Design a protein with these regions (language model features):
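Active-site-adjacent betaalpha module
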Residues: 1-7, 17, 46-53, 69, ...
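Active-site loop/turn elements of alpha/beta-hydrolase fold enzymes
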Residues: 13, 61, 165
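Glycine-rich N-terminal loop/short-helix segment of MobA-like nucleotidyltransferase
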Residues: 16-30
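A short acidic, glycine-rich active-site loop
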Residues: 27-39, 80-90
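Von Willebrand factor
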Residues: 40, 44-67
Length: 204
């Protein structure tokens, strides 16, 4: 029997995106979509947190006070620096309160300094050491960190699943476009319920 596992990667579930006073809360215009996907993700974590064939991993993005990790940033990374978002040890960089009840079940891999969860982290090494062959992506932002991490995982040889109801874009249109047109180029697009069905729990 295969011992390979699925890693549920939680991306961007930090106060600067989700808290009402978060610096980048306004970047997610589709608030209802964001709230729905958060509820779906919490339900999914509840379903898989005790399964031996699943790992739940968080990869928060954090920067030092002078953003020395960023060399002439552009795009969203420039916005992060200019607005002072995701500063290490700041309230905005912390994982949102909704996940606190799962603190013993979620492994946090630190070091992320860019859009890709594999960048500047030991994520790949950890996944291979723990026999992970499939990565399921949940979080924000669909067109940025989700897409970047998904492409990188695919290039590294992992099977990639993007969870359509556990991810959120800046707008509803962006979310739908990526799920319909972009993600299928390198990944499987599933709902959380479909993920559970395609990876049913196997009794010992």
């Amino acid at each position: 029997m295969s011992t390979n596992k699925t890693a549920l990667l939680l991306i961007g579930f930090q106060n600067d995106y989700f808290h009402k006073e978060g610096i980048l809360t306004g970047a997610l215009e589709d608030v209802s979509g964001r709230d729905r996907m958060l509820e779906n993700t919490l339900n999914l974590v509840e379903e898989v947190k005790d399964r031996e064939d699943f790992l739940v991993i968080s990869t928060p993005i954090q920067f030092t006070e002078n953003y020395s990790e960023l060399n002439e940033p552009t795009g969203i990374l420039k916005l992060i620096k200019d607005t002072g978002a995701f500063l290490k040890d700041s309230p905005g960089s912390q994982t949102i309160e909704e996940f606190s009840r799962f603190s013993d079940s979620i492994l946090e891999i630190k070091g992320k300094r860019g859009l890709n969860a594999f960048s500047n982290t030991n994520l790949e090494e950890f996944l291979r050491k723990n026999d992970v062959d499939r990565i399921a992506l949940a979080g924000v932002v669909t067109s940025v960190c989700i897409d970047s991490t998904g492409r990188s995982a695919h290039e590294k040889g992992f099977e990639v699943t993007v969870l359509s109801d556990c991810t959120a874009g800046r707008t509803e249109f962006e979310q739908q476009f990526y799920c319909d047109q972009i993600f299928p180029l390198y990944a499987t697009v599933e709902t959380r319920e479909e993920l559970i069905r395609t990876r049913p729990e196997v009794s010992a």
